[in-house]
Amino acid sequence: MSKIIGIDLGTTNSAVAVLEGTESKIIPNPEGNRTTPSVVAFKNGEIIVGDAAKRQAVTNPETIISIKSKMGTSEKVSANGKEYTPQEISAMILQNLKATAESYLGEKVEKAVITVPAYFNDAQRQATKDAGKIAGLEVERIVNEPTAAALAYGLDKTDKDEKILVFDLGGGTFDVSILELGDGVFDVLATAGNNKLGGDDFDQKIIDWMVAEFKKENGIDLGQDKMALQRLKDAAEKAKKDLSGVTTTQISLPFITAGAAGPLHLEMALTRAKFDELTHDLVEATRQPVRQALSDAGLSTSDIDEVLLVGGSTRIPAVVELVRHETNKEPNKSVNPDEVVAMGAAIQGGVITGDVKDVVLLDVTPLSLGIETMGGVFTKLIDRNTTIPTSKSQVFSTAADNQPAVDIHVLQGERPMAADNKTLGRFQLTDIPAAPRGIPQIEVTFDIDKNGIVSVKAKDLGTQKEQTIVIKSNSGLSDEEIDKMMKDAEANADADAKRKEEVDTRNEADALVFQTEKTLKDLEGKVEEAEVKKAEDAKEELKKALEGEDIDDIKAKSEALSEIAQNLAVKLYEQANAAQGEASEATDAQEGPKDANTFDGDFEESK
């Protein structure tokens, strides 16, 4: 069975891993980095992903960051003269990671396990699966990020019974999960979190502070300057990282804008104390989910054996301090917070292929599921933190006499009123025989698969008529749309490969021109003029071809020059060998014939 790669599709950074033997390994990208920025840019019709896209973000307004925060919504982003769904942009990142894995493994990769925040709702999970499909990946499993982290941590500890708390603060999302590990079973007991809280919010606090301070000093609002804002974002991210290791950092942005008197520079010092003050509300927002998860699991802090920190934002000292305070434990530092999720996803891939034995993963649904009933009430069928996959049925009836149809309004959330929860979908069961209200028996069944994706069935027990839907949110893509996007993605991949081939061909041709010029210089006066002219003409033909766009012409001219250059090189070597032979003969002639009584030998000096 072919390898199943593990992918951590993050808000700010992503990572890809693979199981080698019994060990999960992060695959470095072509730049040698173990994580890849989740950044996509468009330039002259070309798609740029990762480190290269992030490097040019300051000067390129067609750069898209933090697309994960839009997954599961109908929001689109405009770039490259068209509109893209979050799934399409995410697919470009996934394609990049897929190519990295294929280059490393030396084989095609078609299957992946992709992680999502534990608190992702159905729409966000479905969108992630669609992104994988567009990227040409069969998504074997969607795994919650904290669960994947626990897998990576606990794979070699399956003989122990432990309860662990995973505190996962990434670039754009926050989750807390409580898991029980024992006999190879990874059982998620509870999960809580916030899909709108992460490292990006910490960056934004620094940006807002810099904008306010600069306006106070210079009367200019940098918040209105798109290019300045991108420079501020980069500086804020760097300052945040610096303050994890030092207590003060200098922010220096020369020529940030221009005033009436000329260019203006931004020079500010940010202390850790000030940073803690600016971000106090964000750190505090992580406290309640920790308590909620413990409460839902029916545990106290003394029951927790280990605390794992996941996500780059858990390096912030104030966050670490809050975790210490809430759990009365020193967080475990044995896992790399940036890499552990992808590694866990690769392990789950190994479980699916059978390479990892005796490991069972029992995940949970993060939010309650149910339907709207009379009076706009939210009636739950499946409570949050129920182990998945699962199925639950309940019988309902009509609200009016002779009601011919019922509307099934499917919801996800925790609020008592339907209007306050997230709509997953609506469908109708029709042709209900006329009867007084309360008589028809309508059975509603919820199914949640191992990926946390929901399907709902309504059945009239009298007529046995039923209606089923797999939940598609308002951002859900039809199969036709996904197929079209897959073809577009493949076309882009082909175009990228063609572009790379063109660049390689041009580079090789340039090198050949340079090498030929060097060879001709070395052969000056040593070969016939006709041969030199033949090489000169072929070289000029290739240089002329390089000025055009016809790659086939460049290839043909390169081959012609290469053949001539090889013949010249052979002549150069022949001449060098001939000269060496002549020199050797001349030396022998100078030494004269040896005396018959003379012989060569070694001697030792006697002492």
Curated annotation (Swiss-Prot):
GO function terms (MF aspect): ATP binding; ATP-dependent protein folding chaperone; unfolded protein binding
Stored PROSITE patterns: HSP70_1 (PS00297), HSP70_2 (PS00329), HSP70_3 (PS01036)
Keyword Oxidoreductase in record: no
Disulfide bridge map: none
Stored InterPro entries: ATPase_NBD (IPR043129), Chaperone_DnaK (IPR012725), Heat_shock_70_CS (IPR018181), HSP70_C_sf (IPR029048), HSP70_peptide-bd_sf (IPR029047), Hsp_70_fam (IPR013126)
Keyword Chaperone in annotation: yes
Annotated keywords: ATP-binding, Chaperone, Nucleotide-binding, Phosphoprotein, Stress response
Protein name: Chaperone protein DnaK
Organism: Lactococcus lactis subsp. cremoris (strain MG1363)
